[in-house]
Amino acid sequence: MTKKRIETGTSEGDALGFSADLFSGWLELCDDCRLYLYCIISRHRNEGNARNLIRRWISDGYDVRIVKPSVIMQHILHKFSFEQFHEYLPDHYDDEVEVWRRRFTPYAPKYISCPAGRVDTA
């Protein structure tokens, strides 16, 4: 599986709506449409930008996963039916780490049509 680190202030970040005028942070985009958000700082607090960004990613078909979210972020994630899980992310952590994502259901999209082609993941 190929992963690409994407930061705000890059063309890849802008293509995902993760723009430097709204956020500071970084994520990893995998070629299987998993999107791991490791760090996000909103430049304009309480304006709904993080919520809108997550909504966009879900709508675009990404399997959005938030690593070690803050309490405020957890509140946002509950509204999108995210749940706490644990994953092993050996590139960044020695042990399993808290990752919030939506539980798969038979009715959930399988992310096969994600727009990963919009972003160079190689």
What are these regions (language model features)?
Residues 57-72:
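Conserved GNAT acetyl-CoA-binding A-motif
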Residues 46-59:
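Conserved acetyl-CoA-binding loop-helix of GNAT-fold acetyltransferases
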Residues 83-100, 107-110:
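Conserved catalytic-core motifs of GNAT/GCN5-like acyltransferases
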